[in-house]
From Swiss-Prot:
The keyword Plastid applies. The gene is rpl33. GO terms for biological process: translation. Its main location: plastid. HAMAP family: Ribosomal_bL33 (MF_00294). This is Large ribosomal subunit protein bL33c. It comes from Cuscuta gronovii. GO terms for cellular component: plastid; ribonucleoprotein complex; ribosome.
Length: 66
């Protein structure tokens, strides 16, 4: 039997600093985190302040489309 797909879905958070400063960064790549959110309680895009190992500081990570 299959599991029911609930309101909780997986989302990807991407570093906003790495995306904006892609032309002059020291390391290549973009920092991403995978997490879950309840789509009924939080219908808007999620933004969390998390540590970016590429920027070496805490910076806002925003939700991206899959």
């Amino acid at each position: 039997m299959e599991k029911k797909k609930g309101v909780r879905g997986k989302i990807i958070l991407e570093c906003t600093g790495c995306v904006r400063n892609s032309h002059n960064r020291v390391s290549k790549g973009v920092s991403r985190y995978i997490t879950q959110k309840n789509r009924h309680n939080t219908p808007n895009r999620l933004e969390l302040k998390k540590f970016c190992p590429r920027c070496y500081k805490h910076i806002i990570h925003g939700e991206i489309k899959k």
